[in-house]
């Protein structure tokens, strides 16, 4: 009797062990498959995020360069109109000169802060809007004036600065970008020369760059001159306080294209675009932290998906292991019934065989 009970317990353990082994194998295969697929999916998504961020930045830089070029072309056309259609065309003492000079300003006052014509000694000849020049102002010492005298064939673009030439009763400060050029002047019978000055409103550039930075989600864009001087930066306030640094001098040496650089131990992608005629550069920066944040968000999604999938497969594997081990359990029950003196037949259901086989004990 004890021997029969011992044999019964042994068979029960065998059945249990077989089901456990089947379930363990299925779980191991499932776990390895899910982890491998999750890792591959994560790596693929990480590469896709990196490429997408850089690709989007390249597209933004390209479209912004086109827009800035278009705006600056408009300003240059205003400058050329002032030079060739007014200064070169009319005597500076004529009413027609004053009329056309004023009209040109009025038509383009949304883009330019002022128009001015100076003689070769720095004397103010004409200005729009009409303004009183500040006392003791050294016009010839201004960068825009010196640049115009040093290279007389070119239109020179200054970096943004506060206009400081004229009195303003309201004490307003106007940020401008000065365009200047050495020009010939008609002054009666006496030919002369001087410097034509067009002060473009800084907002023409600032508004464009502010717009793309406001919607960039961590990626930022700034503009520098050919020698690395800052024209626009979204974090200029922090830079003025010493809370943020930008290596604009190094960036000024980059040619147009995309670069992978390391700054303070952090990797970042830099996209460089050239602004026509001025020598300025528009630079888009994709910090590593931006890509890391996006990847971390996806990492949580992957982890949650894997956990849900594992719970579903765990239940599925349990059902499959029960199904596979069912013939063995049925055989065990048949043997137990036979040993207990019940049925004289042992029922055996073979896997993959639809018709059961009965083994009769002789």
Where are these regions (language model features)?
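Extracytoplasmic/periplasmic ligand-binding sensor regions of membrane-associated signaling proteins
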Residues: 111, 126-199
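Alpha-helical transmembrane segments of integral membrane proteins
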Residues: 26-38, 302-313, 317
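Short, hydrophobic beta-strand elements of compact beta-sandwich sensory domains
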Residues: 178-181, 187, 192-202, 261-302, ...
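Membrane-proximal alpha-helical signal-transduction linkers
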Residues: 323-346
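Extreme N-terminal signal-anchor transmembrane helix of membrane signaling/transducer proteins, especially
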Residues: 1-47, 51
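Single conserved hydrophobic/aromatic residue that forms the stacking wall/gate
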Residues: 351-362
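Solvent-exposed, extracytoplasmic
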Residues: 98-108, 195-238
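Extracytoplasmic/periplasmic sensory segments of membrane signal-transduction proteins
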Residues: 3-4, 22, 39, 43, ...
